[in-house]
Amino acid sequence: MKQLILVSFLIAFNVKADDFSDINTLLDGLHEDAHRGNFEAYFGRYSSDAVFLGTDKTERWTIQEFKSYAKPAFADGHGWTYKVIERNWEGNGNTRWFDEILFNEKLGHCRGTGVVELINDEWKIAHYALTMLVPNSIAAD
């Protein structure tokens, strides 16, 4: 019985570790595709009903709206570049959520947060929000 429990624990742990490895690959690929302007590959990482929140208060886009916004930026083979500084994960079942600290030459340090879902055995980004980080010391009281 103890062996069965141990084997079950090890299998569950490995599945979770594999999931997080797959999701890290998904997001690392997202940022690489954006950097290289790989439009189809970039948007292929999102679910068909994904939502993207940009840094401006008006930037709440369905995936189709986000594609329209991004197409000109990707047209010359360059999108945008964010370097991943750190990433954290939580979740269970077919849903995971994450936060990541990014660096962009124009915007400085930013935070990306999002939700990924396992859809047809493939992790897809269902929600992504990009925010600029503002130190508390310079924020208005």
Where are each of the predicted segments found?
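Sec-dependent signal peptide recognition
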Residues: M1-V7
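Short, low-complexity N-terminal intrinsically disordered segments enriched in polar/charged residues
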Residues: L6, A12-G44, S48, Q64, ...
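Short, linear, compositionally biased motifs with a strong N-terminal bias
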Residues: L10-I11, I125
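Surface-exposed, charged secondary-structure patches
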Residues: D19-D22, K67-G108
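A mature extracytoplasmic/lumenal domain signature
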Residues: Y46, D56, E86-N88, I101-N104, ...
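A short gly/proline-enriched turn/hairpin at secondary-structure junctions
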Residues: A50-W61, P72-G77
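Short hydrophobic/aromatic-rich beta-strand segments that constitute the beta-sheet cores
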Residues: F52-L53, F98, I125-H127
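Short beta-strand edge/turn micro-motifs at domain boundaries
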Residues: R111-I138
